[in-house]
Amino acid sequence: MRFDHTNRLWLATTHGLIFRDNGQWHVYSTTNSNLPTNYIYSIDFDSQNNVWCGTFGAGLTCFNGTSFTTYTTKQGLESDFVATVCVDKNDVVWFNCRSSQYPEIYGLGLSSLHNGQFKTYTANNSQLASNTIWDIETDAKNNLWLATGDDKGVTQFDGTHWNIYNTDNSGLALNEATHIALDEYNRRIWFTCYTGGGVTYANLQYDNSAVTTLNASKELTIRNNHVLLDLPANVSVFDTTGHLILSDYGTNIDLSNLHRGIYIVHTSNTNYRAARIIIP
């Protein structure tokens, strides 16, 4: 799910490319367009508001508002299974191709498309930590941030230098980061880390592309409508409209009085900030 430069909502789905405009939903599929497949992994937008889509088995495709232009292994892709897609501030399209045999788990490196030319960085020809990349994001300085597989943590790439952050050299909660989100207002990068029982959230604050703090919540558990924490923390619960529903402090916060619905739980103390979506 992404918003384009005109604030229209776009969805990557298994039923095609969907967007919402002026209160109306629109669907592009193989039946009403030249979209190569209905299985869309991810989407992002270039400076011209073209939509770039990674697909499951049909390559990388670009929608200019009228038609789709598709790139496959015939044009130079490592594979036609293209997972996460990210367009940087120079309109370089970055993406991770996946193994055609095991596309859900095996990646083929960090690839880019710029001015019609493909380039791929791998763990063999560069300092890329893992060929499997779960997510890609760019920061305000146009650095790439990669959530890498194989327990390799998070990688920052400025086009020349690679910086790797893991549990040994930072406060990253776990080494298997799965998703990345950019908070431009607060100059923070947020990561989710796979825990086997859900996700934990870490935030990274950067200044001039240098890491100044990296603090993570390693113990945020929600069980039987209670927030359980390893250390006392401020806990705030918001509904989906952003209204504060509950505020408390401690290590065991009772949520049993919440009505059924979707809520966002924020926890924070001097050591970490964390968030979790819950449905009590």
Which functions belong to the PLM regions below?
Residues 212-280:
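C-terminal outer-membrane/trafficking sorting elements
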Residues 1-210:
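Carboxylate-rich, polar loop motifs that coordinate divalent cations or form catalytic acidic clusters
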